Amino acid sequence: MKFLNKIIHELLAQNTDLSAFNIILPGKRPIVFIRQILEENNYSGFLPNFFTVEELINKIADQQPIQGIPLWLFSFDVYRSLNLIPRDDFSDFLKWFPTLQKDWDDILKFSDSDQAVLQYMFDEERIKEWAQDLGEDDDVPRKKFLNFWQNMNVFLPVLKERLQEKNWATSGMIHEAAKAKIVDFAKNTKEQFVFCGFNAFTPVEEKLVRSLLQWNKAQCFFQADRYYFDDERQEAGKFLRNHKTWKEFDDNRAFQWIEDDFNQPKKIKVYEVSGNVTQTKVLPEIFKEINNKTYSNTAVVLLDENLLPASLDVMHGVDNLNITMGFPLKNLSFSNAVKRLFYLQKQLEKNKSSYYYRDVFPILEELPKSVEDEQIINDFKAKVEERNIVYISKKLLHELLGGLSYIGLLQKAASTNIYLDMLIEFCQQVKWLEIDDIQYENVSHFENAFRIIKNQLTPYNIEIKMETLEILINQYINSESIDFQGEPLRGLQIMGLLETRLLNFENVILLSVNEGKLPLGNSQNTYIPFDIRRFFDLHTFLENDSIYAYHFYRLIQDAQNVHLLYNALSSGVNTGEKSRFITQIEMESSHEIEHLIIENSSEPITTKPIEITKTQIVQDRLQKWKGKVSASHLTSYLYNPIDFYLSKILNTSETDEIEEELSVKNYGNLVHYSLQEVYEVLKGKVLKESDLKNSVKAIDQYINIAIEKLKHQPEFYEKGMNYIHKAIAKKVIENVLNHDLELIKQGNKLEIVDIERKFENIDFPLDGNDKISFMGYIDRIDKLNGTLRIIDYKTAKIKNLTVKIDQDNVDEYFHNSDRKQALQLCIYHYVVQHLPEFWGFPIETGIWSFADAKKGMVSLQFDKGNIDDAMKSVRSLILEILNPDINFVETIKTY
């Protein structure tokens, strides 16, 4: 830490007792390093006092800081007391006040008069609109903006006055209050101040430093470098060049220090990386180049805080790791769960009868849970998925989740106050669970926020709706972060850019060195236009760019090995453009820069099929399978041997998933089950016209029974596409019944023999004495004019029911998935031939497709060959399945 070492040696040369000094720093991060340096120098006296410049300004102002939720509530109370138009409620107020408050703080910090800026904004809008007739409608956008600044000229002065009455102050007001006291403070204080490593000052901070310098009660140590200090074009030196012109720096007091470190030899590598997270994958390769494997002089600087989790994933081999940066609260799972809880409450206000499953499931997954709660949640999800419940009734939710420790959070709250109490209690319970440190901090932040909101609401008598509370919490989540602090003296440092101030590292690795990240560019949320900010000396994005330029150059000026990574892919707000700071050092510096292009290391997805060897265990299972072979097993094998292996041999099943729209499979089941109910009543009868006409009238009743069989809720079919699917299913059933009715009207004799006829133990010989046994169900068996019809219902269209089999293709004929319908019908034909009760009847097999139900049954036809030839091909297929030398190989579909 070269710069800090230099300061300490300078101070020790002046006074061996450092307790005489107050050391003022931009942030608290360097304090621990200063203490280490003092220890290394065997300093045994009292330590100096350490302050950030904000703390010193606060001390001088002597006002109580107020920010965040307490400030928002107090400010709204003032705003509503003024009866301004429009009379925004608290939720509307929260949409504009946080941004305005930042602007107001900027005005108070940088301008001579906040009233002048506010009046200027109002006058500016009036001038823009003087020649336009805005009419009487207050909703015209420009008129609303004009009214806004008119209101702010009333509201903000009153807010300042009310805050001052309580000795409360925003950060801008603290600066304004300190400004009036600085001269007296500098004159009367007996203390000595040392300002270290500053770059940009607010006017009040500058006045404080210069006043103390004038009274010889301060000294300043700057960390400048000739590379950007002497070159007027370099924005990094903008503020430091201005400081050097202060009259306080003269022959008796030199401007300290301007080094020449940037131009010293150093290795700089620029990495063009394809992908944001891919940058983190490069880190292990960079670490290999670092000789000191303790990484004690290495910093990884994340310009995008969202890369922290991915960075930690690749650093598992680093023994000592120190994180010093803020991680946004909004990126943590508990934060997402809290946001979802408030969204759920808002939905419950709209829908008083049921819960949408997608509103509930993520909450249950993301909230920390006990072992008991986890079991309750798993059972709940299993039952909801099994029954395909999209909208869960309140009664059912309580029935299935009644034992959940936080069930109250999922129910409609009686009031926001009661709900806040429940949230506070829940946070307390969660902290007793086994959760990691980050989640513990996450929960603690929210517990504190809920307490603040509850305590602050009481004196203001503000009526808070759940929607308003949601906005308040979301504002809090988006503005807060968890600050990580570890052991900074050991190991690898992971930091944000601001945390690097005053610190120097031999090896520096910066990620996301993209335009828009470094510098941030024109991305400020502000109501004050650029030209007005410039006119009143408020900081614009140009000043912010200069500040970030200084941080960048200062960090790398003392480094020996610099690695700059940027994401070259354009996605969302990222343009894929490298930071102009990289371009500057490429074009303007004397350093040789090595450029590397890192493509995404992931290989393209290969289409290599899965292959399962038929081991002895698999063969044993196949032997067991031979006792229960169904036609659907063989069609499954034709479609994909791996699916057959998993579902029919290993007996695995797909996980139940909730269908918001009825799937093709369940649409088929709905029609199938309905027809089963219709014809079950007619089984054993020779049908009459009246039978079928009565059945047509009762279709709705049969469909409802089918819905129960599917374990679906009736509400599932009440709207949207599912309502249409049900209507189509009804039409299909009607078409089937009408087709049968038409047959009878034409004088045909139709008898329903059986429905869902189960068969098993129908032996089918293989080679030698080997055999398999067929089992399964036939959807419908009827007799039409004495001919036995074997009917299989299909949702799909009919395909390839004409068999052309001969000696040349007999073995391979049914090894084609396009012929699976004919294969199934041939097996049914064989089975029925071997059922004694059907001996002597002519047999016809066919498919009745729901896709064209009016057509009726389409029969299997043999252009070449016969059923015996067909069964030879079936035998060949079964032998292939059983053959130990033929592996199960995945069929990869190409579309």
Model-derived features: positions:
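Anion-coordinating catalytic cores for phosphoryl-, nucleotidyl-, and glycosidic chemistry
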Residues: 1-52, 57, 61-64, 209-210, ...
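Basic/charged alpha-beta structural segments of nucleotide/phosphate-handling enzymes
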Residues: 28-188, 203, 378-385
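Low-complexity, compositionally biased segments
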Residues: 80, 91-142, 146-149, 228, ...
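Coupling/hinge elements of helicase-like and P-loop NTPase modules
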Residues: 90-93, 235-266
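Acidic-histidine catalytic/liganding microenvironments
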Residues: 97, 215, 835
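Structured, non-catalytic alpha/beta "coupling" segments that mediate domain-domain communication
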Residues: 116-117, 217-221, 244, 636
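Conserved helicase NTPase motor core
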Residues: 128-239, 272-275, 506-507, 671, ...
